[in-house]
Swiss-Prot record:
NCBIfam families according to UniProt: fabZ (TIGR01750), PRK00006.1 (NF000582)
Lineage: Bacteria, Pseudomonadati, Pseudomonadota, Gammaproteobacteria, Enterobacterales
Domain of life: Bacteria
Main function: Involved in unsaturated fatty acids biosynthesis. Catalyzes the dehydration of short chain beta-hydroxyacyl-ACPs and long chain saturated and unsaturated beta-hydroxyacyl-ACPs.
UniProt GO BP: fatty acid biosynthetic process; lipid A biosynthetic process
Cellular location(s): Cytoplasm
Family listed: Belongs to the thioester dehydratase family. FabZ subfamily.
Annotated Gene Ontology cellular component terms: cytoplasm; membrane
Entry keywords, A to Z: Cytoplasm, Lipid A biosynthesis, Lipid biosynthesis, Lipid metabolism, Lyase
GO function terms (MF aspect): (3R)-hydroxyacyl-[acyl-carrier-protein] dehydratase activity
Organism: Yersinia pestis
Active-site residues from the entry: 54
Gene3D superfamilies: Hotdog Thioesterase (3.10.129.10)
Name this polypeptide is given: 3-hydroxyacyl-[acyl-carrier-protein] dehydratase FabZ
Entry EC no(s): 4.2.1.59
């Protein structure tokens, strides 16, 4: 039995995800099957901006960014499984359960994220995810993403220069009044 391998290069990833530098954390999709699984790569470079402070002299890829990289992989799988979204729609990272970190990820590592579709219910899609370096598990988690609806156009608000004076703020115009009970 043969299976088709689907790969996605950075140009295709940029077409699917709204993330951009420095927050795009998926460099390539190695393979996927729509509605089932996706394997993606994050090449961890010492040039990542967060290594300046996490931690000086002992750079460690932040755990929350490992989770974000896996969440971005779930977003790609959702897009490839459900099709492109309507203008104004996004897939949002909606929740995480049972996140576990097994070992640090450091500059020079190539992190492989493997995400699998679990179920979809009431607009939420649940995925499991595993991140590995050199075949060794570095993180596991169960994640949810939600498909947003296009936002209604925002009302135009015009603030005239005479509405706010340096020593007076009109609460009914600039700051909504919050009544204490």
């Amino acid at each position: 039995m043969t299976t088709d391998t689907h790969t996605l290069h950075i140009e295709e990833i940029l077409d699917l995800l709204p993330h951009r530098f420095p927050f795009l954390l998926v460099d390539r999709v190695l393979d996927f099957e729509e509605g089932k699984f996706l394997r993606a790569v994050k090449n961890v470079s010492f040039n990542e901006p967060f290594f300046q402070g996490h931690f000086p002299g002992k750079p460690i890829f932040p755990g929350v960014l490992i989770l974000e990289a896996m969440a971005q992989a779930t977003g790609i799988l959702a897009f490839k499984s459900r099709g492109k979204l309507e203008p104004g729609e996004l897939y949002y990272f909606a929740g995480i359960d049972e996140a576990r970190f097994k070992r640090p990820v450091v500059p020079g590592d190539q992190m492989i994220m493997e995400v699998e579709f679990v179920k979809e219910r009431r607009g939420l899609t649940r995925f499991t995810g595993v991140a590995k370096v050199d075949g060794e598990i570095v993180c596991t988690a169960t994640m949810m993403c939600a498909r947003s609806k296009p936002a209604a156009p925002a009302e135009s608000v015009v603030v005239k220069p005479d509405v706010v004076k340096p020593d007076v703020v009109k609460p009914d115009v600039v700051n909504p009044v919050v009544k204490e009970s």
